[in-house]
Amino acid sequence: MLSSLAGKLQGKTKFLIDVLKFYDARMLKSSSMSGIGKRGDPYLVKVVQGRSRKHSIASAKDNHRYGEDSWFISSTPKAEVMGVADGVGGWSELGIDSGLFASELMFWCANYAKRESFDGRTPLDLLIESYSEIKGKTDPIVGSSTACLVSLNRRDCTMHSANLGDSGFLVIRNGRMLHRSEEQVHDFNAPYQLTVVPNERFDNVYCDRPELADSTRLPLQEGDLVLLATDGLFDNVPESLIVKTLGKYQGVTREEDLQSAANSLVHMAKDLSISPNFESPFALKAKAFEVDYPGGGKPDDITVILATVAVPQND
């Protein structure tokens, strides 16, 4: 069974990567700036950084993947949308790359986000429709993934979110934490996750519904920082250190400066993940769940999307 599954996935891998490369070539051209929009509507200046646990920091940015993590950004005249997904690594024991499932989930979210009717107010709908798209295929990609979507309605500058699992986002205003998403877990290191299983019966996997995602609404203002990331960041870098690092970039709108901030967070997460004596957020979670963990960080794939709210200047 496993060899059959692996053979099918190899063909799907090539097809999916080819499709993603085509859509990446168009999307990366507008990665930091918004769609045309109405004059004066706020927009997001956005940057992305990450690294695979097994490879270098620039391992797969062009494919919108860092290891089993995947991401997307989308800009239209009505909405700015960002998303991250973390493929659940346990499937690797069956020869299945959950990064493919995460990639396809983000691909469809990006696709639906570009519809003219989408105005950023219902990111949960993107998640529901994308998951349904994957499950509805005759021979779907198999795997599991967390997902976090954040969208900005450009007309009223209100942020809407849908977060399922232990990826997440936070908002910083005036150097202080304004909001942080709620983590959703079944147990220690067992996040809520969207899942597609093979035709064979699988009883030992979590299969959560996208409707379980935590949804929030938050008015934003010029200069607010929005950080979206997988647990490779949040499991290794304490919230206080994230806020301190990003506080230096409050009000910054130059893409180069934001990229420097994102780079710093990713390097910090990587260094702390391999520190054996550091009391990481992951180690503290283990203690809270009364799980025997020797301490230190948690080596993992890391994906960070950092954005700031900007308003076009009058001529």
UniProtKB/Swiss-Prot annotation:
Gene Ontology CC annotations of this record: mitochondrion
GO molecular function: metal ion binding; protein serine/threonine phosphatase activity
CDD domains, per database record: PP2Cc
The organism's taxonomic lineage, starting at the top: Eukaryota, Metazoa, Ecdysozoa, Arthropoda, Hexapoda
Protein name: Protein phosphatase PTC7 homolog fig
Pfam family, one: PP2C_2
Residues annotated for Mn(2+) 2 binding in this entry: D86, D231
Domain of life from the UniProt record: Eukaryota
Enzyme class: hydrolase
Reactions accelerated catalytically: O-phospho-L-seryl-[protein] + H2O = L-seryl-[protein] + phosphate; O-phospho-L-threonyl-[protein] + H2O = L-threonyl-[protein] + phosphate
